[in-house]
């Protein structure tokens, strides 16, 4: 395949990194020093790459999603603590000499009395869970979810904005003295595990709330975050945690950053980001930088008028969840634009890889020769992906379908023609045979969007609408994507090489 075609491959950042061959000499840039970026850089370093740079606009590591007010007291929480992403991050920390006490999960119950469940046992149950027939499961728990939505509304304040950063907090704070309302609802662990495993939590909440305005962070906080992590989660004896005692996710991320620096990874902190403005007449927003021309690629994208007008850091009134999702993407577009500027001393080379967040598009711009990555889909699918895919510069898209079945860790082989035909004929069905092969989260929200709208409560995408002039295939777009991680890396390595 010619490199003159814009190649968009939906991959998690570190998965894309690991697919590269070791003779790739260009700079590999990672945008964002949160868990996604640190994990990407860590994987690259472990695989022997020495040309890694991390760009962070906010000037600190660890991200902004790890704290929440609990009864008006700030606690450190982990957005991904119930997922393989955090689990693998901890494994990465252990591999560089950081020890951990056994992690206990404290489940908030009536009167906030915690019941400890060993984290390892929870994870073991997660992986071992049998996935029932999805349709029966949906019918079984839809009433429960509807009930839980009401509980969730009582527990979480959707209008919360962090006054120090003006950022909308993705983990909504519990209202004072409302913790015991959790006693009004309970879901059997096996049902919760099955829903989580099938990536059905978000669609069920959408169905229950009769709205598509809620993104994944907003629709499932009570299910995801009914598990409460006490502030001393990472505390331990000095001999148990040889590299120091970690009392927060932030400090652990900082330690990872220091380790990466010791291995030669360059951090560009407080990287200048282009500003966003909207014309007073309400026309399309634009990216502006004094004395710097905005790259054509982003002029095209922004001209679609599908993205919000305000930088999230400047938001002073609550955004709808959909706008919050798009604002995240918009920030990353700003960063991408800034890094493409050739007259800035900290600009990365015009050839290289740019990794943005956990779900991303790897892009090659034939006009500049730049290989990069746009975060368009945003896990939940509410930033208008079509707006980006239909823009003039990135219309020619081609990628690969790939699927790993988590239960047996075996690759399911399809030629591209067979796979695209399967998408067209089978994804609208909900029969057991289809689900036997499609139970992994590795396709994440993208795969679910093609399901039947009457069951999922969502309008399925029309594949033809997003094909543009090329073909659109999806690859392993999990929210976290660590399932069968070694196997996926090996397969991705072979698949990417096919394009080079």
From Swiss-Prot:
Pfam families: Amino_oxidase
Keyword Nucleus (UniProt): no
Coiled coil: none
UniProt-listed Enzyme Commission number(s): 5.3.3.13
Molecular function via GO: oxidoreductase activity; polyenoic fatty acid isomerase activity
pH dependence: Optimum pH is below pH 6.0 with (5Z,8Z,11Z,14Z,17Z)-eicosapentaenoic acid as substrate.
Essential cofactor(s): an oxidized flavin
Keywords from the named record: Isomerase, Signal
Record PTM: Glycosylated.
Catalytic activity reported: (5Z,8Z,11Z,14Z,17Z)-eicosapentaenoate = (5Z,7E,9E,14Z,17Z)-icosapentaenoate
EC class of the enzyme, as a word: isomerase
UniProt entry tagged with the keyword Isomerase: yes
SUPFAM superfamilies associated with the record: FAD/NAD(P)-binding domain (SSF51905)
Database matches in InterPro entries: Amino_oxidase (IPR002937), FAD/NAD-bd_sf (IPR036188), Zeta_carotene_desat/Oxidored (IPR050464)
Signal peptide positions (record): 1-21
PANTHER family the UniProt entry points to: PROTOPORPHYRINOGEN OXIDASE
Summary of the function given for this chain in its UniProt record: Involved in the biosynthesis of conjugated triene-containing fatty acids. Catalyzes the isomerization of a wide range of substrates containing three or more methylene interrupted olefins into a Z,E,E conjugated triene functionality. May be involved in a stress tolerance mechanism as response to intertidal habitats with direct sunlight, desiccation and high temperature.
Self-association and partners: Homodimer.
Designated name of the protein: Polyenoic fatty acid isomerase
Protein's organism: Ptilota filicina (Red alga)
């Amino acid at each position: 395949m010619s490199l003159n075609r814009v190649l968009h491959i939906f991959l998690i950042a570190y998965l894309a990194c690991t697919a590269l061959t070791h003779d790739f000499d260009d700079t590999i840039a990672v945008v964002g020093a949160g868990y996604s970026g640190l994990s990407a850089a860590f994987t690259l370093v472990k695989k022997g790459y020495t040309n890694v740079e991390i760009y962070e606009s906010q000037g600190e590591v660890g991200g902004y999603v790890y704290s929440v007010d609990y009864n008006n007291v700030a606690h450190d929480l982990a957005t991904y603590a119930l997922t393989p992403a955090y689990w693998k991050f901890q494994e990465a920390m252990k591999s560089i000499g950081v020890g951990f006490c056994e992690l206990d999960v404290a489940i908030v119950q009536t009167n906030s009395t915690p019941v400890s469940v060993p984290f390892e046992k929870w994870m073991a149950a997660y992986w071992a869970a049998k996935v029932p027939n999805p349709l029966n499961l949906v019918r079984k728990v839809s009433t429960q979810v509807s009930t839980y939505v009401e509980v969730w509304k009582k527990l979480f304040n959707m209008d919360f904005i962090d006054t120090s950063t003006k950022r909308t907090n993705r983990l909504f704070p519990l209202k004072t003295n409302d913790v015991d309302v959790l006693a009004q609802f309970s879901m059997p662990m096996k049902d919760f595990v099955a829903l989580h495993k099938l990536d059905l939590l978000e669609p069920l909440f959408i169905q229950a709330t009769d709205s598509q305005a809620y993104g994944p962070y907003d629709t499932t906080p009570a299910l995801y975050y009914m598990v409460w992590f006490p502030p001393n989660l990472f505390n331990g004896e000095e001999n148990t945690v040889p590299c120091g005692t970690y009392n927060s996710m932030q400090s652990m991320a900082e330690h990872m950053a220091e380790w990466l620096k010791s291995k030669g990874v360059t951090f560009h902190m407080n990287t200048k980001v282009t500003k966003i403005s909207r014309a007073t007449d309400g026309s399309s927003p634009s990216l502006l930088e004094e004395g710097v021309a905005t790259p054509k690629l982003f002029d095209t994208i922004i001209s679609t008028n599908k993205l919000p007008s305000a930088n999230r850091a400047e938001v002073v009134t609550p955004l709808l969840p959909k706008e919050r999702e798009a604002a995240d993407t918009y920030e990353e577009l700003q960063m991408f634009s800034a890094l493409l500027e050739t007259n800035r001393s900290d600009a990365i080379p015009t050839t290289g890889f740019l990794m943005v967040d956990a779900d991303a598009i790897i892009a090659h711009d034939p006009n500049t020769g730049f290989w990069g990555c746009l975060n368009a889909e945003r896990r939940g699918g509410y930033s208008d992906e079509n707006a980006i895919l239909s823009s003039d510069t990135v219309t020619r898209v081609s990628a690969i379908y790939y699927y790993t079945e988590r239960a047996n860790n075996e690759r399911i082989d399809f030629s591209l023609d067979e796979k695209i035909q399967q998408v067209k004929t089978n994804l609208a069905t909900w029969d057991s045979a289809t689900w036997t092969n499609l139970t992994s989260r590795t396709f994440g929200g993208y795969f679910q969007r093609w399901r039947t709208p009457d069951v999922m409560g969502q309008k399925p995408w029309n594949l033809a609408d997003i094909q543009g002039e090329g073909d659109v295939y999806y690859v392993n777009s999990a929210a976290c994507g660590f399932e069968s991680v070694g196997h996926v890396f090996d397969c991705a390595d072979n698949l990417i090489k096919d394009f080079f």
